[in-house]
Amino acid sequence: MKKSKTKSKKNKSRRKLKKWPKLVLLLIFLATLFLILKKSLDNYNITFNNTYDYLMNKINEQKQKQDEKKQQENKKKQDEEYNTCINQKYSEKEKSEKLTQVENELTDYLKNYSLSIKFVDVKTNYTYSYNESKVYYAASTIKMLDAIYIYRNALEGNLNLDSTKKYTKNFKVAYSAGLEKYKIGDMVSLRNLVKYAITVSDNSAHQMLVDYIGFNNLKKYGNSLGAKNTLIGGDNFGQIDVNDSIVYLSELYNFIEENSEFSEELKSYFIESDENFLKDEENGIKAATKYGEYGNFFHNNGIVYAENTYFLSILTNLGKKNGSSTIKSINRKIQGLQKNVYENHVEYCKQKIYSVQNDWQLMNKLLKYNWRDGYERKEKII
């Protein structure tokens, strides 16, 4: 019996030992399977992340291209709006405190003198005037109107510049340098009469031109342009204020800018005119000017061809000596004023066109959407 029991125990032990290899194999299999699955899962995560990163990079690249294209389009639109603004005429709403201060300083300076001035920038139409309603004796400034009338009518075919007029004794007056080489009875062309009246302010040439044109015709012509004081006062010179001066200068400028066969010829007479204190030879600035002088009246009206062309009328009661130096000084101050006008205009257009867009771009940078994390966050702007 004992042997039988012992044998039974041994058989049970053998059966248990036979089960262990299977269990070990099962565990090894499961462990191997786990490792395989884990590695596959890791590879999947890596592949997924790489794929995600790749796709997000592509999306971001496309978005960046779209943003850059939009920025370029916006920049082009802004530049067009800026150029439009720059080319617009000046308006009072754009005046800065600095420009106001410059104007006030100029006004305070002018209060020291008996004079009137008017300045008009041709491009922007900015205008500054002082004592503009005061009326002066025109003196030789009226000769500008003689010249414009003759050359305008020549251009329109109403007269020939080479037509002549007889120089008679009744036309001969003082201060007639151009006609000194002519004898009484000589014939003088209209072209030369205008040339002498402008370049050397020949008074006899002026008398002959007024006679040729007709006093009333010349007066009506000045009025038709917008002048209020043309030939008022009982002689062939009349009266003038700075507003009339600008009217004459504007018409002269328009004639010159038409680039007709006569434009440069007439312009050259005014550029070469004597007593021209609006030109600045040191800085290469030319001016198409006509002066006027009688007693204490001393004037300069001109188109100043600076970097930006402007009209300037300075009418004074200062006489030639003080008047000439004062006119030069005022012209320099006007150039400073004009510089401020353009700086003011540029800054105004920059603020108007670019500042709003720049504010929008700043806000756009402050709030950027982080697509990977799935929420909006503020990012530091470098």
Give a label for each model feature:
Residues 2-110, 127, 253-274, 294-382:
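Structured C-terminal helix/loop/strand segments within mature extracytoplasmic catalytic/sensor domains
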Residues 86-99, 182-262, 269:
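Active-site-adjacent helix/loop patches that line small-molecule binding or acyl-intermediate pockets
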Residues 115-119, 159-164, 206-210, 229-235, ...:
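Surface-exposed patches in mature extracellular/periplasmic domains of secreted proteins
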Residues 120-122, 197-201, 209, 235, ...:
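Active-site-proximal beta-strand/loop segments in catalytic clefts of secreted hydrolases
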Residues 125, 136-165, 312:
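Active-site SXXK
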Residues 154-191, 195:
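Active-site-proximal loop and beta-strand segments within enzyme catalytic domains
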